[in-house]
Every structure is written in C-alpha cells, then in structure tokens.
Amino acid sequence: MNGIFTTLLYEMEKHHDTVLCTIIADSGSTPRGMGAQMLVGEKGLLCGTIGGGAVEGQSIELGKRLLQERRSTVHEYKLHHNDTEDIGMVCGGDVTVHLQFIAADDPAWQKLAGEILRRIALRQPGWLTLAPALPVMTERT
C-alpha cells in the first residue's frame, strides 16, 4: 500500500490523473484476492499488481480509457470458459475490479494519500474505506 500511495502523490504533484484498480470481490480460483491494488497512468501500469495475466492487462487498458473519459467503473472478469466474455483464462473463478478515476487536483485524494502514508510511517492502524462518493480514513478501534 505504501508504494501505491507514494506513487499516487507523486503523480498528483506532476498534475497527472490516475486510476486506482482494486479487486473488490473474488470467488473460486483467482491470481490475486480481494484488496489487491494497482495504479494506472496514461502510459499504463505505474505501481502494484492485481495478479498479472489477462485480468491485469485488460484492467490497464480499461484504466487508460477511463483516464481519457475521466470516470470510474466496476468490471467483472470471468476466469473460466464462457460465452459472454471469455478472456482466455482457466483459473475457474471470478474477479470484480473497481477502477477509480483520481483527478490530480482532487484535494480529498491528496489528503487521503498523505494521511495513509503518515499512518504507515508512524505504524498507526486505520481502516481505508472506498465508497462511490468519497474515500475516508477512520480510526481503528
């Protein structure tokens, strides 16, 4: 998580928008589980991984498109042979990825990333909750 948010702040300081990709649900056999993250910029992967392979590759391409459209989305990948969206993986599971557009000038994300890095440096616990409206960092009790 340190690398993701260090890179996010760096990109924001350079006035570069990004997309934060987070696995928000998984079932069956998958390369990575819920909570895995990567950060995507206009040229592709900046930091992190959500498991490599087709899921990561397609999420990077979708992330680059979302940067141009300046929007977020949720995308579900089926990692088994199917007739609707076969991506060629045979792991047997399903993965849902939240792709969150982050504008470089968004003060809420700047504050959140700084707070996360501060807590990591001080080894302070906390909960990161990503909701559609606004990210929030709360005390863990």
Language-model segments: residues:
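Segments forming oxygen-rich coordination pockets for charged ligands
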Residues: 1-141
